Curated annotation (Swiss-Prot):
One of its GO terms (cellular component) is cytosolic large ribosomal subunit. GO terms for biological process: translation. The gene is rplY. GO terms for molecular function: 5S rRNA binding; structural constituent of ribosome. PANTHER family: RIBOSOMAL PROTEIN L25/GLN-TRNA SYNTHETASE, ANTI-CODON-BINDING DOMAIN-CONTAINING PROTEIN, RIBOSOMAL PROTEIN L25_GLN-TRNA SYNTHETASE, ANTI-CODON-BINDING DOMAIN-CONTAINING PROTEIN. Belongs to the bacterial ribosomal protein bL25 family. CTC subfamily. Keywords: Ribonucleoprotein, Ribosomal protein, RNA-binding, rRNA-binding. InterPro entries: Rbsml_bL25/Gln-tRNA_synth_N, Ribosomal_bL25/Gln-tRNA_synth, Ribosomal_bL25_b-dom, Ribosomal_bL25_C, Ribosomal_bL25_long, Ribosomal_L25_dom, Ribosomal_uL5_bac-type. It comes from Pseudomonas fluorescens (strain ATCC BAA-477 / NRRL B-23932 / Pf-5). This is Large ribosomal subunit protein bL25. Part of the 50S ribosomal subunit; part of the 5S rRNA/L5/L18/L25 subcomplex. Contacts the 5S rRNA. Binds to the 5S rRNA independently of L5 and L18.
Length: 199
C-alpha cells in the first residue's frame, strides 16, 4: 500500500470562476492530472486532505496514489499554486507515473554541514528550496543533498556543483540554466558599526 494517498472527484465545471467557487463554497482544491497515454483530467480534492498530505515533506517527491472516483492511478506533484499571503494550495498539477517512462518532479533540497562555513565567519543564504528533476519512477529521490562543508566565504554554490543521484538529471541544467543554490557571504555590518570602525 502506498504511504501517500489522496482522494479526488472529477469536476466538469471549469474555468477561473468555477475554481473560485470550489475553494470558497466547498473547501475544495481544483487540480489537473495529465501524462501517460490518457487525456488530461480536471479534478477536485478536499483542501484539508491536501494540507494533511503536504505536512510530510516527502510527499513532494514521492509517488502518490490518487483515487479519482474509485479509479486509482499513481502520480507525482508537478506544480502547486499557493495563496500569496496565506500560503494554502489554490491549484495543483499532477503527472501520471508510467513504469519505464521518465518523469519530472519537484524534490526538496537538504543542506548539510552548514556549521563549517559559519565557523569561518560566513553567513549562508539559501537561494532555492527545491529542484526539478527528471528520472525513472524507481530512481525518484526523496531529497537532494547539498554539502556545504567546503564552502568558503564568497562562494556561490551552483546546480552544477551538486552531484545528482544515480539516474537523476537536473532539468534546469539540461536546459543550460546553472541555477545558484546557495551563497556564503561575509556578515553584513550595520551602518552604525561600520561608522564606528571607520572612526
Amino acid at each position: 500500500m502506498n504511504d501517500f494517498t489522496l482522494n479526488a472527484e472529477v469536476r466538469s465545471d471549469l474555468g477561473k470562476g468555477a475554481s473560485r467557487r470550489l475553494r470558497r463554497l466547498a473547501s475544495l482544491v481544483p487540480a489537473v492530472v495529465y501524462g501517460g497515454d490518457k487525456a488530461p483530467e480536471s479534478i477536485s480534492m478536499l483542501a484539508k486532505e491536501v494540507a494533511k498530505l503536504l505536512e510530510n515533506e516527502a510527499a513532494y517527491s514521492h509517488i502518490i496514489e490518487l483515487n479519482v472516483g474509485g479509479t486509482k492511478q499513481n502520480v507525482v506533484i508537478k506544480a502547486l499554486q499557493r495563496h500569496p499571503a496565506k500560503g494554502h494550495v489554490m491549484h495543483a498539477d499532477f503527472v501520471r507515473v508510467v513504469a519505464g517512462q521518465k518523469l519530472t518532479a519537484i524534490v526538496p533540497v537538504h543542506f548539510i554541514n552548514e556549521a563549517a562555513p559559519v565557523k569561518k565567519g560566513g553567513e549562508i543564504s539559501h537561494v532555492i528550496a527545491e529542484i526539478e528533476v527528471s528520472c525513472l519512477p524507481k530512481d525518484l529521490p526523496e531529497f537532494i543533498e547539498v554539502d556545504l562543508a567546503d564552502a568558503e566565504i564568497g562562494t556561490i554554490v551552483h546546480l552544477s556543483d551538486i552531484k545528482a543521484p544515480k539516474g537523476v538529471e537536473f532539468v534546469a541544467l539540461a536546459h543550460g540554466n546553472d541555477l545558484a543554490v546557495a551563497n556564503v557571504h561575509a556578515p553584513r555590518v550595520a551602518p552604525e558599526a561600520a561608522e564606528g570602525a571607520a572612526e
